[in-house]
């Protein structure tokens, strides 16, 4: 990637530092497809259509964002309890969602999922973030956990690490009644609070579907 970094620095000197930092973020992606997608979004040339191109980009809706928001459309009433859906099969899918407390619809959505045998903790945002990754503080009742999350799907999705580190992060939330995701951003996505009461019990089918170690 050194050759690419040089090309970027040569063609866009004012943004070279920010671009290189963003590329370092892409390199931290463990999954090859996610890493490729990160580079693709970072290095894609600007659309010559100007404002129209910006509108197209702003209108991009990602798969995980859609999964979270579509599940929340099935919620009855103004409730916040964890909503669980399961799709059986060789590679079962489990999705658990809850909307942000204190927000009017459309509300941000916290989602735990097992899709393609990968455990994910994500937040679907209604106001996009213009960064590639971000430091977050997870306040689970009185416990504060510091972490580093990725920003995906054109800024509309926050995602924790995957694999064992991501699973460990989820386990640290067990027993808490609420989770506040604090990104420090100066907008509506800055602090989001969710009802996670009963998470350890509700997540049982996800643990089975994604074959958590020791389950």
Enumerate the language-model features and the residues they cover.
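Gram-negative bacterial Sec-dependent N-terminal signal peptides
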Residues: 1-11
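A generic "folded-domain core" signal
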Residues: 11-24, 33-215
């Amino acid at each position: 990637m050194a050759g690419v970094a040089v090309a970027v620095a040569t063609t866009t000197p004012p943004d070279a530092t920010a671009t290189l930092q963003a590329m370092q973020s892409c390199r931290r992606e463990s999954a090859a497809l996610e890493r490729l997608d990160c580079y693709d979004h970072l290095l894609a040339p600007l659309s010559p259509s100007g404002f129209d191109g910006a509108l197209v980009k702003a209108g991009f809706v990602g798969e995980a964002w859609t999964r979270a928001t579509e599940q929340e459309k099935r919620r009855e009433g103004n409730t916040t309890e964890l909503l669980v859906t399961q799709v059986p099969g060789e590679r079962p899918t489990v999705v658990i969602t809850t909307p942000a407390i204190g927000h009017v619809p459309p509300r941000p959505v916290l989602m735990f999922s097992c899709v393609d045998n990968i455990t994910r903790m994500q937040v679907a945002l209604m106001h996009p973030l213009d960064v590639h990754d971000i430091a977050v503080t997870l306040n689970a009742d009185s416990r504060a956990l510091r972490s580093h999350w990725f920003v995906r799907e054109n800024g509309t999705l926050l995602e924790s690490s995957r694999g064992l580190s991501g699973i460990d992060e989820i386990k640290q939330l067990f027993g808490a009644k609420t989770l506040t995701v604090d990104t420090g951003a100066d907008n509506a996505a800055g602090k989001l609070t969710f009802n996670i009461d009963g998470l350890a019990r509700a997540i049982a089918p996800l643990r089975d579907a994604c074959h958590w170690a020791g389950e």
